[in-house]
Amino acid sequence: MAKIQRVTEATLPTEFGIFKIVGFEFPDTKKEHVALVMGDVEDGQPVLARIHSECLTGDALHSLKCDCGFQLARALRQISEEGRGVLIYHREEGRGIGLINKIRAYALQDQGMDTIEANLALGFKADERNFSVCADIFEQLGVKAVRLLTNNPAKIETMKSAGINVVERVPLNVGENRYNVGYLDTKAKKMGHYIVHNNKKHFLECPHCQSEIPADE
């Protein structure tokens, strides 16, 4: 497969601040990824960064079955507060199995399977994503070292193996609620994610405001 190429960019005002959106594309498959960039990220200093895998249900439809939408909002807010950073929107929906298969996996979860068991039952690996493209994107953006917003050790290891210096893991524990606590448990126990649970009551953070609301109301 040919290496991904930087093809276009534009200004993108958001509720979190003004970013530069940079489009990337594989020349052979036309597979697309994007990065949101704020500030000077080519000065050699570690950059606050997030690799965010596409999740239509969480990011756009505000599903409570996962923590994706909440993580997206929190990451953009933290980058904006620092005035400098990169968020790669990694276009591998459903941990790489695609939207329709993710819905099929949801149906199996409705019958009692966890998120890993459902993927395996459909003939997929627990996680089909390839994060190496994100290292190529960081390289093309001039980013050499990152403070990575993640709970996922696989992202850290892939970046390190590809030559991106991960100087710090910045935890991203947000959005826990009664609908996704089992999902988060599974990611921690079966995938090694660094999940810290709220030990009092399950709360979720509203992606569009600064307040927190109880998930059980």
UniProtKB/Swiss-Prot annotation:
Binding site for GTP: 50-54, 71, 93-95, 115, 150, 155
UniProt-listed Enzyme Commission number(s): 3.5.4.25
Cofactor binding note: Binds 1 zinc ion per subunit.
Positions bound to Zn(2+): 55, 66, 68
Protein name per the record: GTP cyclohydrolase-2
Pathway: Cofactor biosynthesis; riboflavin biosynthesis; 5-amino-6-(D-ribitylamino)uracil from GTP: step 1/4
Biological role stated in the UniProt entry: Catalyzes the conversion of GTP to 2,5-diamino-6-ribosylamino-4(3H)-pyrimidinone 5'-phosphate (DARP), formate and pyrophosphate.
Leading EC class: hydrolase
GO-annotated molecular function: GTP binding; GTP cyclohydrolase II activity; zinc ion binding
Cofactor annotation: Zn(2+)
Organism of origin: Actinobacillus succinogenes (strain ATCC 55618 / DSM 22257 / CCUG 43843 / 130Z)
Family note: Belongs to the GTP cyclohydrolase II family.
Key words, A-Z: GTP-binding, Hydrolase, Metal-binding, Nucleotide-binding, Riboflavin biosynthesis, Zinc
Biological processes annotated in GO: riboflavin biosynthetic process
Reactions catalysed according to its record: GTP + 4 H2O = 2,5-diamino-6-hydroxy-4-(5-phosphoribosylamino)-pyrimidine + formate + 2 phosphate + 3 H(+)
GO CC term (a single one): cytosol
Catalytic residue positions: 127 (proton acceptor), 129 (nucleophile)
Entry keyword annotation includes Zinc: yes
Gene of this entry: ribA
Matches recorded under InterPro entries: GTP_cyclohydro_II, RibA, RibA-like_sf
